[in-house]
């Protein structure tokens, strides 16, 4: 059974590792200007039915949660989380840095 306690405690799927080895020596521009990033963005646009959507990829779960929460909540709102919830135990500092309180139940 997989247990995703965070972004980095499980190994990668074998197919992903194979593909990384296959493409390892390719010379590509960084910062999201490569063909793989563009392909991923197109797949996301298609899946969402939004061909004109701006897609921004982030490198980790904490960063992603902080950006999404900060952009969705009003300044006076907070996040309600279980006491044992990942956002409370592992990400609260990142969330509260944006000015939002994590309210543990």
Indicate residue ranges for each PLM-predicted region.
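Conserved beta-strand scaffold positions in the cores of enzyme catalytic domains, especially
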Residues: 3, 55, 102-104
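PLP-dependent aminotransferase-like
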Residues: 73-105
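N-terminal amphipathic/basic leader segments beginning at the initiator methionine
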Residues: 1-19
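Buried hydrophobic packing segments
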Residues: 64-72
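Conserved N-terminal alpha-helix of the aminotransferase class I/II PLP-enzyme fold
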Residues: 13-61, 83-89, 94
């Amino acid at each position: 059974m997989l247990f995703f306690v965070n972004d980095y405690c499980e190994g990668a799927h074998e197919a992903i590792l194979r593909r990384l080895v296959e493409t390892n020596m390719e010379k590509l521009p960084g910062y999201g200007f490569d063909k793989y990033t563009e392909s991923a963005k197109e797949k996301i646009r298609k899946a969402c039915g939004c061909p004109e959507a701006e897609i921004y990829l982030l490198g980790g779960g904490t960063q992603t949660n902080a950006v999404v929460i900060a952009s969705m909540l009003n300044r006076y709102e907070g996040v309600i989380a279980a006491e044992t919830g990942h956002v409370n135990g592992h990400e609260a500092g990142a969330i509260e840095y944006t000015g939002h309180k994590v309210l543990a139940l």
